[in-house]
């Protein structure tokens, strides 16, 4: 695809609804599925779609994300004609540092985009779990002679009020956009994935800034402006698995759905692999008393207890007689002897003491990064 289309991943979200899990890292850097971070899905989709240049726009707590992405080699994006560029906010002459919205983040990086000089820009969110062929979406964009194409997912009517809803004609041309409507007319929900003709979007963003017109957000400002001016705006209809993991409940659900031979994400599909930074760890070890059922156990784990329908990430320790059920345990965590974990997310390097009970039967429980529970303070 060469430089025909540049992908820009919006990865600066703080993810306040994830609570303890994002106190020290950005939401796209949160672990998922045992060996991944959430942003791996967008990056892998880019690599599998033949996109050579990717800009990752960061903001909140970017260190872990920057370290994880590195030079892009884990996704094959470190070649002579390809690359991943991490783009951070900067202090502009008018004093703005933090991005004011999704499209404002693009405006602040116009110089970078112009250097790549793409015909199209693909705007992505770095905090969704899904697989998508962006090249197929681009072909739809071209076939419709569109200036903007919005990826949409058909959602249940009762959930439509949570999304930006696209009302279309019989040819999938968008005639109306409603942001979280109280009484939705359609069930076509925006996925926050857009393809724009770059020259046109560039003009819209620059003119908006020059004339004092708020163009800071794609959903609130840019899409309505395109429709009002009669631009050709179409949908790309997606029918695969897609999950917004912006809440504790949805992150837990997505991990539980990831377990199993027939998971909806088709994680074992060799034709569309999800790549990540390779971590060096020894093989996992299970004692003769260990009992592991219907679970994912990643390299480096030591298991001497009971694990059922759960995910153990890299280098997790489960001590004797511990019971873990319906839970996601992030890398480096230690589960003490006789501890009982049910419907929980255990953060990276957390320590759960001997005999501690964490029960999320009513509401998913969360233990944060390096949090220590039930271990006496040596001081």
UniProtKB/Swiss-Prot annotation:
Protein's UniProt keywords contain Nucleotidyltransferase: yes
Pathway this chain belongs to: Glycan biosynthesis; glycogen biosynthesis
GO BP, one annotated term: glycogen biosynthetic process
Presence of keyword Nucleotidyltransferase: yes
Gene3D superfamilies hit by this protein: Hexapeptide repeat proteins, Spore Coat Polysaccharide Biosynthesis Protein SpsA, Chain A
Enzyme class, first EC level, given as a word: transferase
Family listed: Belongs to the bacterial/plant glucose-1-phosphate adenylyltransferase family.
Subunit-level organization: Homotetramer.
Listed name of the protein: Glucose-1-phosphate adenylyltransferase
Native source species: Streptococcus agalactiae serotype III (strain NEM316)
């Amino acid at each position: 695809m060469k430089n025909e289309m540049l992908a820009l991943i919006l990865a600066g979200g703080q993810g306040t609804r994830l609570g303890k899990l994002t106190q020290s890292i950005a939401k796209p850097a949160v672990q998922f599925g045992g060996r991944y971070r959430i942003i791996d899905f967008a990056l892998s989709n880019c690599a599998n779609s033949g996109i050579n240049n990717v800009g990752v726009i960061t903001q909140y707590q970017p260190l872990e994300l920057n370290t994880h992405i590195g030079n892009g080699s884990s996704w094959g994006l470190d070649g002579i004609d390809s690359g991943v560029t991490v783009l951070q906010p900067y202090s502009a002459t008018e004093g703005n540092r933090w991005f004011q919205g999704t499209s404002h983040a693009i405006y602040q990086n116009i110089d970078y985009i112009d250097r790549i000089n793409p015909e199209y820009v693909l705007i992505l969110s770095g905090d969704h779990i899904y697989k998508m062929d962006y090249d197929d979406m681009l072909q739809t964009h071209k076939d419709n002679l569109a200036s903007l194409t919005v990826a949409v997912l058909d959602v249940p009517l009762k959930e439509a009020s949570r999304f930006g809803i696209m009302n279309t004609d019989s040819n999938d041309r968008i005639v109306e956009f409603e942001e979280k409507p109280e009484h939705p007319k359609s069930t076509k929900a925006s996925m926050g994935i857009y393809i724009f003709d770059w020259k046109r979007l560039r003009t819209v963003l620059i003119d908006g800034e020059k004339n004092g017109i708020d163009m800071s957000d794609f959903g609130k400002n840019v899409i309505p402006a395109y429709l009002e001016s009669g631009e050709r705006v179409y949908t790309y209809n997606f029918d695969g698995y897609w999950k917004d993991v912006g809440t504790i409940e949805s992150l837990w659900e997505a991990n539980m759905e990831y377990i199993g031979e027939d998971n909806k994400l088709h994680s074992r599909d060799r034709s569309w692999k999800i790549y990540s930074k390779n971590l060096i760890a020894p093989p996992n070890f299970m004692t003769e008393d260990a009992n592991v059922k219907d679970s994912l156990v990643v390299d480096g784990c030591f298991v001497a207890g009971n694990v059922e329908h759960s995910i153990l990430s890299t280098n997790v320790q489960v001590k004797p007689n511990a019971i873990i059920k319906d839970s996601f345990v992030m890398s480096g965590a230690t589960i003490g002897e006789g501890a009982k974990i049910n419907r929980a997310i255990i953060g990276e390097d957390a320590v759960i003491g001997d005999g501690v009970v964490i029960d999320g039967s009513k509401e998913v429980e969360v233990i944060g990064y390096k949090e220590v529970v039930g271990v006496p303070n040596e001081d």
